[in-house]
Amino acid sequence: MTDYDDRNNCASNMYLPYYVSTPDFSSVSSFLPQTTSCQVNFPYSSNIAQVQPVREVTFRDYGLDHPSKWHYRGNYASYYSTEEIMHRDLLQSTNRAEMIFKNDSMYSHHAGTNSSCSFFTNVGRNGVLPQGFDQFFETANSEKPNPEQSKQKPDTSVPGDAACNPSTDSAEQTKQDPTDTVEEESSVSTCDEEKNSGSSATKSRKKRCPYSKYQIRELEREFFFNVYINKEKRLQLSRMLSLTDRQVKIWFQNRRMKEKKLNRDRLQYFTGNPLF
C-alpha cells in the first residue's frame, strides 16, 4: 500500500476516538467481579505501565504547542515534519496566496491529482487572479480616459475681449437707458487694465464699476442729505472726486431710480405680509 493510501485512511479515520493498544490491558481483571458486591475494582491494575496521556501523544510530534492546548488538526501530526509545519505557520497571507497559485507542489499532498490545480498555476496580469480574468482588466483600462490627452487639448475659452468689442456693445446700448452711456464709455477705458490683470480669462463678465469706493462713499453721503443736487454742489463734488460734471449727474439719476425700485419692493413686501 502506498503512502497516498495511508494518508487517505488516516483522513477517513480522523474523527474516530483514540484508543490505547490492546496488549496494555492483558493483566486487567474483570470490571465487576462476583466475589464481592461492595468493592469495585478499577480496570487498571497497579503494576500496569504508566500510559502517556492522549493529548501528549497527539502533540508529541509537533513540538510547537503546549500539551494543554488542544489543536483541531492533531491527528495529522505524524504525517508532517517539524520544519514543514514551522514554514507553513510562518507564511504571510500574501505569500500563501502566491504559493497556492504558483507553487502547487507544496500542497500537492492534500489533493488527489494535480489536474484540479492546473487552472490556478497560470497567473494572469493581476498577479493573483488566473488568466481568464485578464479580459475584464483590458476592458476596464480601455474605458479610462487618458489624462495626457485631456491636458493637450487647447484652451477654447473665450477671452474677455467681448467687453471691449463695440459690435457686441452696440446691441446692448440700444436696450439700455441713455443715462448708462457714460458708464459704458468709462468701462471701455478699463478694458486694457483687465487684459493686463488676467481677469478677462474668467467666463463670467466682470461687473462694471467705474467709480472707486471712496467716490461711491462720498456720493452716497451727499445723496443721503440731498436726493436732488444743484449745479453748484455737482461741480464741487466733481472737483473733489476727480469726476466730470456729467458723471456726477448720471450717478444721481441712477441712484434715484434705484431708490424708487427699492421703495416699490419694500411696499410689496409689507403689504403682502399679513403680520405688518
Swiss-Prot record:
One of its GO terms (biological process) is embryonic skeletal joint morphogenesis. GO terms for molecular function: DNA-binding transcription factor activity, RNA polymerase II-specific; RNA polymerase II cis-regulatory region sequence-specific DNA binding. Pfam families: DUF3528 (PF12045), Homeodomain (PF00046). It is found in: Nucleus. It comes from the Eukaryota. Residues 139-207 are annotated as: Disordered. Keywords: Developmental protein, DNA-binding, Homeobox, Nucleus, Transcription, Transcription regulation. Residues 139-149 have a biased composition (Polar residues). GO terms for cellular component: nucleoplasm; nucleus. Its main location: nucleus. The keyword Nucleus applies. InterPro entries: DUF3528, HD, HD_metazoa, Homeobox_CS, Homeodomain-like_sf. The keyword Cytoplasm does not apply. Residues 204-263 bind DNA. Belongs to the Abd-B homeobox family. Sequence-specific transcription factor which is part of a developmental regulatory system that provides cells with specific positional identities on the anterior-posterior axis. This is Homeobox protein Hox-D11a. It comes from Danio rerio. The gene is hoxd11a.
